[in-house]
């Protein structure tokens, strides 16, 4: 049983390290809720309205 707890703790530790803590999912969802698209560069004629993916991409509309 103790081995099971240690295995569970190790898996949870690895999982928590993989989850971004800077709110990047929230910014991406907020962009899509505003009918925008996350892109590296906005196309000609599109307007930059925010950031996505932890400020690595632009939210274009």
From Swiss-Prot:
Keywords from the UniProt entry: Antibiotic, Antimicrobial, Defensin, Disulfide bond, Fungicide, Lipid-binding, Secreted, Signal
Residues that coordinate or bind a 1,2-diacyl-sn-glycero-3-phosphate 1: 24, 44, 53-54, 61
GO biological process, one term: cell chemotaxis
Domain of life of the source: Eukaryota
Entry's family note: Belongs to the beta-defensin family.
Subunit structure: Monomeric. Forms multimeric, probably including tetrameric, complexes in the presence of phospholipid phosphatidic acid.
Biological role stated in the UniProt entry: Exhibits antimicrobial activity against fungi. Antimicrobial activity in a pH-dependent manner against the yeast C.albicans; activity is salt tolerant and retains antifungal activity in NaCl concentrations of 100mM. Permeabilizes C.albicans cell membranes via targeting plasma membrane phospholipid phosphatidic acid.
Secretion signal span: 1-21
Originating organism: Crocodylus porosus
Organism lineage: Eukaryota, Metazoa, Chordata, Craniata, Vertebrata
Compartment list: Secreted
Lipid metabolism recorded as keyword: no
Disulfide bonds, paired cysteine numbers: 31-59, 38-52, 42-60
Listed name of the protein: Beta-defensin 13
Effect of residue 58 to A: No significant effect on fungal growth. No effect on permeabilization of C.albicans cell membranes
GO cellular component: extracellular space
């Amino acid at each position: 049983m103790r081995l099971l707890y240690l295995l569970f703790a190790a898996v949870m530790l690895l999982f928590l390290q993989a989850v971004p803590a800077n709110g990047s999912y929230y910014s991406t969802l907020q962009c899509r809720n505003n009918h925008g698209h996350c892109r590296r560069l906005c196309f000609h004629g599109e307007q930059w309205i925010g950031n996505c993916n932890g400020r690595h991409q632009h939210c274009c509309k």
